[in-house]
Structures are given as C-alpha cells and as structure tokens.
Amino acid sequence: MTIAPFDYVIVGAGTAGCVLAARLSEDRHTRVCLIEAGGPATRAIIRVPALVGAAITNRALTWGLTTLPQTALDSRRIPLPRGKVVGGSGSINGMAYHRGHPKDYDDWAAAGNTGWSWADVLPYFRLSENNIDRRDTGVHGIDGPIHVTFVSKPNPLNQAFLDAFAAVGGYRPCDDFTGLDPEGYGLRQGTIDRGRRDSSARAFLVPALRRPNLTLLTRATVTGIRIEAARATGVDVSAANGPRSVPASREVLLCAGAVHSPQLLMLSGIGPARHLESLGIPVNAELTGVGANYHDHPALAVALEMRNTTSYGLSWHTLPRSLCNLAQYALARSGPLASNVFESTAFIRSSAGADRPDIQIAFQPARRNPNTFPLPLGHGFAMSIVNLYPHSRGEVRLASRDPRVAPLVNPNILIEPEDSAPLLRGLHLVRQLCGTPAFAPYRATEVRPGRSARSDADLKAYMRQAAGTAHHPVGSCRMGIDAMAVVDPTLRVRGIDALRVVDGAVFPGIVGGNTNAPIVMVAEKAADLITGRTNGGRHGG
C-alpha cells in the first residue's frame, strides 16, 4: 500500500527525530511524517526520573542489542541499550545535560566541517534550552522547549563527593558544566521538568502533534530507503497492518541513531560495496565509511556498600521513609523519586598533557544493582570513570539483508592500549576520594573491584572483567570532506540526493560529555540547513 506523499519523511522518533519533526512542521504548509518502530512513551518508568535503571534495562523499551564479543574485555558481549520507543534513547537515558567541551566543536570545524565550530553551534544549544537555574542568555537558553535544572534537594552524599575532591586537592569546583569552561567538580543539571523526565518527545513532539500537517506512525519499522536515479524518494515500512511505502517529495531524513542509521543505509545499497555485494544487496552508492568510525565512551565503575542508610535505596530500615517518598512524589512530584540519581560529577584532566578534561568521574549516591529491579536494593554509592576521548574505533555491519535481523556492532572497546590508561588513573583517583575524611562517617566497603585488587595488574584485570560503555555511541555515518565521510557538513549523504542523516552517527568525533544535548543541537541546526532559515530569525533566548 502506498500513501499520499509527504514533503519530509523522518525515520526514527528518537532524540533528533522528535526535534526535527517539531521544527519542520512549524511551517503549516509542510507535510511531515515521523516514523517510529516502538510505541508511545507512556510508561511510568519513563516519566519518573528515579526509575531510570528500570527504563534502560526494559526489553519492551529497547532493541535488545548486545555487541559482538570484545577482544579487550575478556570476549564479553556488552549490553547496548538503544531506545525503541517514542523519544528513542532520550526516553530511557540518565537525563544528564552536558554539551561537551567547546574545543570539541572547534575540532570538528578544523577538520573541514564548516559551520560546526563552538561559535556556530552555541546558538543551537541555546535554542532548545530552558535553563531554570542559569539565566545567562549569552551561554544558556531560557525559553526553549527542554527544561534543564538541578535536582532541588540533592542527596547528602553528593556533598561528601565534593568535599573529597577538595580534600585531595589539585582540582577546582565548577558551577556550570555546560558553560565556556566545563572543568572541575560540582553538582550537575538534568533534563527534568517539575519532577518528570523532559525528553525531546515530551518537550518538542507532544506539543507539535496538535498540528494537522504532522503525522506520527508508531510500531512501524522502516525496512529500507527507496532510491531512484540516485535520489531518495521515500521509505518502505513494515507494520501490523502490512507493508507500505511512504513517499517523500522533498527529503528523507534518517534519525535512527548510530546503530540503525548505518544499518538502513546499507540495507538500501549505500555503504561498502564488497560488504553489500557479499549479502546480495545492489549497490546504489559506494560509501566505505558507512558503519565505520563507530565509537563510544569506555566506562568502569567502583562500587561501595554501607550499612548507613543515607543513600538512595530500599531496605527494611528505610521502608517508612520510602513510603513517604512515594507519597511525596505522587502528591507533589518532588523528593528522591524526582531525582535522576546522577546529581554530581567531575570533568578533570587525568594527565598533565591533556588540553581539556579527558575523564569524567560520575557520582551515584545509590548502590549499583547487579539486577534490574527498578530501585536500588540496599545502600551504598558508586563512582564511574569515563574515558571522554577514546582512540578505539569499531564498526556496524549487516548480519543479513533481512531488516529484521539485528546488525553486528563491534565497538572495539579498549582495543587501543592507550584507552586503558585514563581509566586506570581514574581508578586510583576514586580510591583516593573514598579514602578522604569526607566519606569516613559512612564506613563504606569497596565491593567492586574490592580491596584485594591492589596492583595495576589487578586493576587492569578488573577493567577487562567489568568495563563497558557510557551508552553514547556516535560516529558511524561521519560528517566530513574526505573519502571516508558519509555526510557533508550540511548532513547530506554523499552520492544520493534528498537524503540526510541527522543524529549522533554524524559526529566526526565523540564529545567530552553526555551526548543527548549535542544530538538535540544537531537536529536544531539540521532544521535550519534543510529549510534555509537561520537561528536568529526563528527563536529568541
């Protein structure tokens, strides 16, 4: 079945797709179709910030992906939670709001990506942002759709984390991790609006769905892009009511993320020719870079447990308090359930030669659960060390020409030896922090890696056994001007007209922070690139 043509067909109602659909449909004469493989984002575990652990591990909300066995991680398969729901991974993520470092974007521009320097992208960060606590309009937006705020009453353990950094010395406090100099330790902001997750689905898409020129198709999986005479003319969709074709008279906009955007390009004959031919897929455009340059932030946690009940968590001793917290959230959407748990962090340089923070220490004032129970059972805290600028690069490849078969994802985590060094330095620092007087009153015991892991060899063994990623995959449809680039600086796919990629897959290199806000920025800028509008002519703030 074929339906009437739309001007724009957007594949994926994730973080970028929701933004793009809302912006393009602002013109009431433009018909936009947004297609999502998952269902609506209506579950409580999505809305309630403290249930983030349940959301990100819920198979009904994700694609259920894992990586290929990782050579440098004892051949383990690493979970790869990617959202399969309206809002995409922005409906299951930790809600942390970071932009990365300004130098990251200047590096993009220096590589030939004109229009992507920090000065170029800052207006697009501001455009989407409604920062409740930061009203500096030179750096922050104050009337954008996405609410950004501090947790109103952080857990007391956060103060111990900050005091520990002060005690160790050599690091400075930072009161704005999204400002011009995001280095140091401090409390951090999240995308939470009055006690609820404020994803791009909630902030951008829900209000836009009132427009008659915007159509949302859910539980509809795009199986391929229609290519005629080197031009994208629409997409093929599989849904409960059968297959259909959705034509696009202007452009097809691929917002399926760093795993599924390259998968769809390759299924449509756009990618490495030898790989496509090996699966019997006719080649529409030979682009060797499709699926290459895939990378993510390697991450490793130190976990501690304690009898003290200050941390977030459930126990018999805190049952009355937990019932009060539940009532507080139900009545006022406040209290511990209104927190995303990730309330403080540090972005620091682990070596003297770094020109910007190269590791993040993310503090979690809750016991790390080895299971998927919605809230932490017991009490404790954890610090996750994140390598912000890994050298290792992996790839996404097709396992089959059948679009129902999951692609093969090999991030090559820590395959480059230099990627382990920042994590090792971070492990030593975390132990220093935990040994300061700030944490002494809590009498916490390290359970992972455990005090028996003393030497660097022991800690490297723990790294192989326990390291994973921060779930920030990017780069698999890289923007650039060289032969390995998949899209140009206007996000157009090379060699195919009327087709763009608009998501984290286009990042030339990963940014030094969480990737949700930068992906929103990419979509905001893409809307201007597509329509020819400029930021200054659309919105203030």
Give the positions of each predicted feature.
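N-terminal redox-cofactor-binding region of secreted/periplasmic oxidoreductases
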Residues: 1-541
